[in-house]
């Protein structure tokens, strides 16, 4: 379904996962200050790449494994004001990044990823949606290994995860000497339990540093009246048409 933002348009007709609040939250929140190079892992329709291009002057590489989703991504890039700064790569991350390390651009100032998150249970009947949503196609340890290798020494990686995945994801950081540098717990309304978590990762000096707790911020998407909260409006108003 086509989706129009303030400065760009997204057609996600062939993508396993359509434009979602998760993606918009991640694209609006990721700390891109001073990032000159950005990698978007699992770009899908190109939403995160386009949001990053609007928010920064960075050169962006959008990596997408699915050929049909990659077609949507390229179309959306071509129709945007930033086609000169976004390059689509149609490839499997696990096959691509070892080769990328032999080339000039081997590390990135920022990495964006809205990763697969269902790792058990029956997969969707739609194979594209299943691939986009299940960690069978990209396990967390594989993702973190790639981030570890591709992230510049002072770089950051931003992700969004559902609450059910957080307990499995965070203990893996120590294995790859990565640490949380920021976290926002997302609720749908006040006094609700968090359903999503925005995470920002950076390199850790030691495994012990990986395990250090940080204080999480909190964001409620809607207020008590059911309208978008002030915090949600402040975060996303540069993108959503009606805010």
Curated annotation (Swiss-Prot):
InterPro entries: DNA_methylase_N6_adenine_CS, rRNA_Ade_Mease_Trfase_CS, SAM-dependent_MTases_sf, Small_mtfrase_dom, tRNA_Adenine-N(6)_MTase, tRNA_adenine-N6_MeTrfase. Disulfide bonds: none annotated. Pfam families: MTS (PF05175). This is tRNA1(Val) (adenine(37)-N6)-methyltransferase. Its main location: cytoplasm. SUPFAM superfamilies: S-adenosyl-L-methionine-dependent methyltransferases (SSF53335). Belongs to the methyltransferase superfamily. tRNA (adenine-N(6)-)-methyltransferase family. GO terms for biological process: tRNA processing. One of its GO terms (cellular component) is cytoplasm. The keyword Transport does not apply. Keywords: Cytoplasm, Methyltransferase, S-adenosyl-L-methionine, Transferase, tRNA processing. PROSITE patterns: N6_MTASE (PS00092). Its EC number is 2.1.1.223. The keyword Membrane does not apply. It catalyses: adenosine(37) in tRNA1(Val) + S-adenosyl-L-methionine = N(6)-methyladenosine(37) in tRNA1(Val) + S-adenosyl-L-homocysteine + H(+). Specifically methylates the adenine in position 37 of tRNA(1)(Val) (anticodon cmo5UAC). GO terms for molecular function: nucleic acid binding; rRNA (adenine-N6,N6-)-dimethyltransferase activity; tRNA (adenine-N6)-methyltransferase activity. It is found in: Cytoplasm.
